[in-house]
Each structure stands twice: as structure tokens, then as C-alpha cells.
Design a protein with these regions (language model features):
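NAD(P)-binding Rossmann-fold cofactor-contacting core
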Residues: 188-190, 199-218
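Short amphipathic alpha-helices in soluble, non-transmembrane regions
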Residues: 58-71
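Adenosine-phosphate binding glycine-rich loop
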Residues: 18-19, 254-265, 269-371
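Rossmann-like NAD(P)-binding element
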Residues: 228-251, 264-267, 271-272
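NAD(P)-dependent dehydrogenase/reductase Rossmann-like domain
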Residues: 1-2, 12-29, 43-46, 124, ...
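Hydrophobic Val/Ile/Leu positions in short beta-strands of Rossmann-like dinucleotide-binding domains
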Residues: 181-182
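Helix N-cap motif at beta-to-alpha junctions
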Residues: 51-59
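Glycine/serine-rich phosphate-binding loop and adjoining beta1-alpha1 elements at the start
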Residues: 80-173
Length: 371
């Protein structure tokens, strides 16, 4: 298995071009079917492509997909220029990366829980399309690793979330006031809503495209998404956390809606961004995007260094055990041909020292050990 990835090391202005919608991910998976399949892991912080084919074949297929996508202009955010900005890792390194990803060790906030569900959803998406063949075992083992890390370490209990950081930014901006939250029915928007509502001293307008949405918390008013600009002028803090591929707040419309000049904090938790960068140029307005939370995330990560180290060890052990299981499967006929005592010794080695077992298994496959 190999991996092409674009993560938080690239700014949101780059990542937004590869924030594929479900339609885009389906088309990309189908493009890779003749090459053996693909599992694209797409979140607000990364786009990672896991595939069994050689790197060169994957890069050609990915570049061709992006060119077609841009040409038809029907797929939103069709601006990716190819795989040039993506990093690559292959074989054992790619598998270990997947395990660390599921464990939350590659997240901006180490150990956050959401990534495990995101990896699972992306894997299930590809599996439903028949695009995960040959990678099922790796993804299932990675998901099990992610669960084990959270069960055996304190990394999740010590972790906060981007939603918590966003709420804290709102609290630092003003002790209380009026908040407008767009995308309140999503996981991120809903978490921000809950955090701000629990603080007290806030009046919240929560908008959603869903007609089924109803505000239940005290001090929360439900509004239709189409009315979002009408509530801007009264808001002190505006949080946008939608999955929309389109701009939610343009600078021109926001400026026209803001009749009262006062300090306002806009928080954009989406990739691609919901809020046009020009909003920051409106007098009194401050714009904070996802990448603006990195300093706060690093501060949180420092508090759980020992838990991170323990999680890294578990991820490495899980990966080695996966490699040992795969090696045992590949050399099963050679193992079966060994004398009973030697075979039992190797199976015991598989449990006690997975790396050493892999080395012996590779030697068997290469014919360097004769049954």
C-alpha cells in the first residue's frame, strides 16, 4: 500500500483545492478502480490517498482526474493542479502513517477523537464502491489501533477539540454577547453551539439548511440559513462551520449587512473556507481560520507529551503486528512445511517479537531458509 498526502503542513489556501465532496471522492475512486482501488481520506485538515498501485500510476491517474474535474467545472473547488504538492510514502511507512492517523497522532490536536470516525467513514465509503480491495486488512487494523490507543492512554481525555478552541476564542473576544453560528447541525457547528451555550451570558442565533433543525438550548434561536446576513449586524461573534463548497459570507455582502461599526470576530472552521478573506478588511472585523488555532493546539499538545509517547508506541506495535500477520499469511505454505518444533517456535516469535518474525518470514519467502 502507498500513500500520497497533503496535510496541515500545507496552508488552507492549498488544502481547499483538494477538499473533495462525496461526488468528487466517488469519481476519484472509480478512476482508480482499474489500478486496484483507492481510499481517499478527506477532512478539513488533510487529503490523503491510499492505493495499492505504483506511485507513478497513481500520480498520472490523480492528475488526469483533476484536469477533467477542472475542465467540466461541475465539481466544486476544481482548482487542484496535480499531485506535485503531495508528499509520498510507501509500503511499511504508508501503513504506519495510516495507523498513526487513526490514532490521532497526525492531527493538529493530538489524540482528538473525530479523526477515527472520519477514517472509518472514508474507508466505508470506498468499500461500498468496491474500491478498497487489498487494503481492507490495513484499514481494519488501523481502526482497531485507534480504538486501542484511546482505551489504553489518556491522550483523548487530555485532548480538547477545534470546537473547544473556537469557543474559547469567542470567550476571550468578549465575556458575553450575541453569537451567530452557521452550520449548527453539523458535528463541528453543533459542538461550538453547545460550548458557547453552556457558558451563559450569550444569545445565540443558529442557522441551518435543515428544516428539521430546532434549537433546544436556552438562549438559542433557530433561523434559516438563507437569513444569515440579516443576523450579522447584531452579532459580536460569527462562527461558520458548514460543509458547503461555496462561500457562505462574501466580503461585499457582509460589509453591506454590517451597518453598526463595532468589534466583531469571524471564526471560519471549514475547508474550503466559508468566509471570504476580504471580511478581515472590514473595519472592526477580525477573521480567524482553522490554521489560526495552531498555537493553541501546540499548547494543548505539550500537556500530554507522555500520553502521546505511549500512543506512538502502541501505534508502532500495532503496525508491527499487522506486518507479522501479513507475513504469516504470505508464507503459510512454507511455514506449514517446517518441522513442528521449528514451526511452533516461529509462531511463538510472532507473538513475542513481531519484527523478528517478519525478518524470518521474509527469509523463508526468499528461500534463504530451507524447510
Amino acid at each position: 500500500m502507498n500513500c500520497l498526502y497533503l496535510d496541515g503542513a500545507a496552508g488552507v489556501d492549498v488544502r481547499k483545492n483538494y477538499a473533495f465532496t462525496a461526488r468528487g471522492r466517488e469519481a476519484l475512486c472509480r478512476r482508480f478502480l482499474p489500478l486496484g482501488g483507492l481510499v481517499p481520506v478527506v477532512t478539513c485538515g488533510r487529503t490523503e490517498l491510499y492505493f495499492p498501485c505504483p506511485r507513478a500510476d497513481a500520480e498520472r491517474a490523480f492528475s488526469a482526474f483533476l484536469k477533467e474535474r477542472a475542465a467540466c467545472a461541475r465539481e466544486d473547488n476544481a482548482q487542484g493542479s496535480g499531485a506535485a504538492g503531495f508528499s509520498f510514502c510507501g509500503g511499511r511507512e504508508a501503513v504506519l502513517r495510516l495507523f498513526r492517523l487513526a490514532a490521532g497522532l497526525l492531527s493538529m490536536l493530538r489524540g482528538e477523537d473525530e479523526i477515527l470516525g472520519q477514517v472509518r467513514d472514508c474507508y466505508e465509503f470506498s468499500r461500498a464502491l468496491g474500491a478498497s480491495a487489498g487494503m481492507d486488512a490495513a484499514f481494519q487494523a488501523a481502526l482497531a489501533c485507534g480504538k486501542r490507543v484511546r482505551a489504553e492512554t489518556k491522550i483523548s481525555s487530555l485532548a480538547c477539540s477545534i470546537a473547544t478552541l473556537a469557543a474559547n476564542a469567542a470567550f476571550r473576544f468578549c465575556a458575553g454577547g450575541n453569537a451567530l453560528i452557521v452550520g449548527a447541525t453539523g458535528k463541528m457547528g453543533g459542538a461550538v453551539l453547545k460550548n458557547i451555550a453552556s457558558k451563559g451570558g450569550w444569545k445565540i442565533v443558529a442557522t441551518s439548511r435543515s428544516h428539521a433543525f430546532a434549537a433546544s438550548a436556552a438562549g438559542v434561536t433557530a433561523a434559516d440559513y438563507a437569513e444569515r446576513y440579516a443576523f450579522l449586524d447584531g452579532a459580536d461573534v460569527i462562527v461558520s462551520a458548514t460543509a458547503s463548497p461555496h462561500t457562505v459570507f462574501t466580503a461585499d455582502k457582509a460589509a453591506a449587512a454590517l451597518r453598526t461599526q463595532k468589534p466583531r470576530l469571524f471564526i471560519d472552521l471549514s475547508v474550503p473556507p466559508d468566509i471570504e478573506a476580504g471580511v478581515a478588511d472590514i473595519p472592526g472585523c477580525t477573521l480567524l481560520g482553522l490554521d489560526g488555532f495552531r498555537a493553541a493546539a501546540e499548547e494543548n499538545n505539550e500537556k500530554k507529551r507522555s500520553a502521546i509517547a505511549a500512543a506512538e508506541k502502541i501505534a508502532e506495535d500495532c503496525a508491527e503486528q499487522f506486518f507479522a500477520d501479513e507475513a504469516a499469511r504470505k508464507c503459510a505454505p512454507a511455514l506449514a512445511a517446517l518441522p513442528e518444533m521449528e514451526r511452533k517456535s516461529l509462531y511463538a516469535l510472532r507473538k513475542s517479537d513481531a519484527a523478528a518474525f517478519c525478518a524470518r518470514a521474509e527469509a523463508l519467502l526468499a528461500g534463504k531458509e530451507n524447510p
